[in-house]
Amino acid sequence: MRLDENEGAFTIPEFGKIQFEGFCRFIDQGLMEELHNFPKIEDTDKEIEFSLFGNEYELAEPFIKERDAVYQSLTYYSELYVPARSIRRNSRKIQKQTVFLGNIPLMNSHGTFVVNGIYRIVVNQILISPGIYYRSELDHNRINYIYTGTLISDWGRRSKLEIDVGERIWARVSRKRKISIPVLLSAMGLNLEEILDNTHYPKRFLFLLKKKERWEREEYLWSREKAILEFYKKLYCVSGDLVFSESLCKELQEKFFRQRCELGKIGRRNLNQKLNLDIPENEIFSLPQDVLAAVDYLIGVKFGMGTLDDIDHLRNRRIRSVADLLQNQFRLTLGHLEDTVRRTIHGATKRRSTPQNLVTSTLFKNTFQDFFGSHPLSQFLDQTNPLTEIAHGRKLSHLGPGGLTGRTASFRTRDIHPSYYGRICPIDTSEGMNAGLVSSLSIHAKIGDCGSLQSPFYKISERSREEHMVYLLPGEDEDEYYRIATGNSLALNQGIQEEQITPARYRQEFIVIAWEQIHFRSIFPFQYFSVGVSLIPFLEHNDANRALMGSNMQRQAVPLFRPEKCIAGTGLEGQAALDSGSVAIATQEGRIEYIDAVNITSSINGDTVRTESVIYQRSNTNTCTHQKPQVRQGECVKKGQILADGATTVGGELSLGKNVLVAYMPWEGYNFEDAILISERLVYEDIYTSFHIVRYRIEICMTSQGPERITREIPHLDAHSLRHLDENGLVMLGSWIETGDVLVGKLTPQTTEESLCTPEGRLLQTIFGIEVSTARESCLRAPIGGKGRVIDVRWINRVDDSGDNAETVHVYISQKRKIQVGDKVAGRHGNKGIISIILPRQDMPYLQNGIPVDMVLNPLGVPSRMNVGQIFECLPGLAGNLMNKHYRITPFDEKYEREASRKLVFPELYKASEQTANPWVFEPDHPGKHRLIDGRTGAVFEQPVTIGKAYMSKLSHQVDEKIHARSSGPYARVTQQPLRGKSKRGGQRIGEMEVWALEGFGVAYILQEMLTLKSDHIRTRNEVLGAIITGGPIPKPDTAPESFRLLIRELRSLALELNHAIISEKDFQIDREEV
């Protein structure tokens, strides 16, 4: 337990604080710790000594801005300098120099890294904490229970101790091989007397030893050498006689004890606490005393004198943050540096080498480049919207090195554990194979020094009944002794609380007790949930599965042309926008002197502060990042005031969608199965119009025939394709690009023989005698769906690792996408759907005041999905729209009184009806429902319909990026069937379910064409294409398709020959032919 520094003060912590604290811990502690552990290096003759002064390291200012690093595809880093000293003992000469070790990638203000121009983020990993854990499990016969103790090292390696049904104790060295504990203890250096003196159950231990074979008792308990030989045989499955040697002992020490038994500081602390040991924390490897104490505790567990561990409890888990991951990479790099210096220092005795000559800086660059480029926990930052960036930085992953995999993780591991309360969100997780393996931190959770997850609670004093905020660890104290009141008690005042029966959590169960017995209480209703879930209003009325979908789909919402803040929210929208870094904030109090679209200049006590705005910048996911000034020239601003809104913020609040008028009713089957029909107003008024910026790149390489050239003079291309190129061969800014247009003209040199190999080259040479060009065009063209406006062109020159000059051209194209049929829209409650039809405004159902509905949703999507929160959201949305009001509603308002949500919604509708003089807004006979009029006929619908203003978002699943068609394309080499997917120019593939659908309609000939002629019949499919073009009949094949030939070949590989026989009607002669 830890008392908070700001005792009594309550604020929601910054959402990116987890990442910032981790990186600062790496810079302040991790670097110094690893540099301090760097050993002194001497040559074999001990004439030269090399050492580093780790306490005096320095990090230089970055030589490039973060924004320039993105545009130039560079890494945003700082240079690490460390003083080094070399001593020559013969000449007694001491040299001390500041050496350049390498580049350390820096974290930016968003908690991310820029590596090779790409934003990346390091995800926190949740692992089993190193230590020993005792469990009971069924034996291989699934009849009897055996008791095991699993020792987990700092790197995730496991060693298991077990007591079998015959009460014999074993140590598992692999899944199939095990060794008896007396042999292991003797190999580690203990004799029988030391074993019996340091155990709590010496009689029980002797009783177990008597069950061993006689030869084992007598030989291996008294001879360490024989025990080591026996251990070596079991470990490596060696048969025959072995001779003891120190090299064999050293190999056993390095391969087994050093790799499997490295506990680390956290593991040593856990082991001391579990086994009641008093071993210093700097002893990071397991000792014979540890194994003996673990066996002793295992005997106690076997006979009911110990406790079994819950491996899924958070007290047995730890968080490996960005600090730990970067420190591991830094440790590996220093190990490589040590080896390099040792090799270099041997040849440095004769020549006068300085510390700078002994150190190479490429090791750091390569190591960190490999880590950020290929490590599973270094991920491509999802920048669809600001909420996505926040949620990505607060993820917890069970996957990665030392963790689990999607195939091996059990249901128990994926499930929600009671210890997650207030630490890990029980709702927000991935869908699919990674469900339960990728979670999200709760809003108030923080990571402790030892990697444990902490959650704040108010401690209630028994004497004064005062409250102090403390952070609780997920340890035994909380589970065994403390009673924690849930959020229901927040509404009670002091006088009522003492007489109130309160729901609480005690020993991982929920109970109801008197308020006097409460030790802690929750501090906030949002405490248990992640950021995305906390943005869902009326969350308590939704099923958890739909709340999960709503949280995930908020992160898929694209920034809109004109964003709008929600009418019904939760109150966290402001902090989400602020912590995301998408808004520009005044750093100090001052007065705005100058403002334009790019810069905002303010004066503070005569000093000028210039704030740069982000203008049409591309994100990792091709969405548009933009800032709009919100202050005026001459206006006085205060510190922390918003100067410019982002692409998804309005007034400093996160705005991911639009408030549209929705009706829950069926309409001619067009909203069947979650389909959605919308009004054309959403298209023509750019309600759901979004901007996307796509980057196309092309490299200029040095070939064996010479360098490639960027030019406008491209032979054999018509002028229409080259119309947008300038004299340098680059596309001009502001050009409107269509599919197939040339963006960058490039010629690649080739030999004359290569030119003459093409049919057109030989034809020109033979008929006209034209000299064939020695270069072929390799231009960058706009792909299918790549039309748009060119907003930027950048020619980047940089030197690669080999020293060559690498040139790259980047072309940025802005695309304006209106909503259309096939796009996906969703609300915040998991109510998602695809646009099925866009109706004219006059055909849409309209209200009694003549306003047509914007969107018609299927009412059957509410009761079966149990996400009634969308109904509670749209009704105050309608009232707020009529009265120009916004509501910020804290979830779980039922703690105030029963039916609190209903009592909030209906009075607001009544007020709106009174203020606007529209009695139809609130009709007592059916409150919340209204009479709608059919726009096509003017007739009133028979049943009243639920109408409201719902907050709907347009998601990144857009039809422009998914629709695909092909007439001909690539085929698989083995099956000769069309490839799959748009990226491979794949074709239509008829699977088993598609065959069933076609069989249901009885279309036998179409089915045969799709399965054979148009698929894998090589000769006939060419003829079919010609017949379709010319309008001729479809030819009938006379040979088998390729898939049937493949089946025959597979049968032949199994030594099964397939033939068919033809029997003549006249003489009944049998003619066998090979298939």
Curated annotation (Swiss-Prot):
It catalyses: RNA(n) + a ribonucleoside 5'-triphosphate = RNA(n+1) + diphosphate. SUPFAM superfamilies: beta and beta-prime subunits of DNA dependent RNA-polymerase. It comes from the Eukaryota. It is found in: Plastid, Chloroplast. Its EC number is 2.7.7.6. Residues 966-986 are annotated as: Disordered. PROSITE patterns: RNA_POL_BETA. It is an enzyme of class 2 (transferase). Keywords: Chloroplast, DNA-directed RNA polymerase, Nucleotidyltransferase, Plastid, Transcription, Transferase. One of its GO terms (molecular function) is DNA binding. Its main location: plastid. GO terms for biological process: DNA-templated transcription. GO terms for cellular component: chloroplast; DNA-directed RNA polymerase complex; mitochondrion. Gene3D superfamilies: 2.40.50.100, 2.40.50.150, 3.90.1100.10, DNA-directed RNA polymerase, beta subunit, external 1 domain (2.30.150.10), DNA-directed RNA polymerase, subunit 2, domain 6 (2.40.270.10), RNA polymerase alpha subunit dimerisation domain (3.90.1800.10), RNA polymerase Rpb2, domain 2 (3.90.1110.10). HAMAP family: RNApol_bact_RpoB. PANTHER family: DNA-DIRECTED RNA POLYMERASE I SUBUNIT 2. Belongs to the RNA polymerase beta chain family. In plastids the minimal PEP RNA polymerase catalytic core is composed of four subunits: alpha, beta, beta', and beta''. When a (nuclear-encoded) sigma factor is associated with the core the holoenzyme is formed, which can initiate transcription. DNA-dependent RNA polymerase catalyzes the transcription of DNA into RNA using the four ribonucleoside triphosphates as substrates. This is DNA-directed RNA polymerase subunit beta. It comes from Pinus koraiensis (Korean pine). The gene is rpoB.
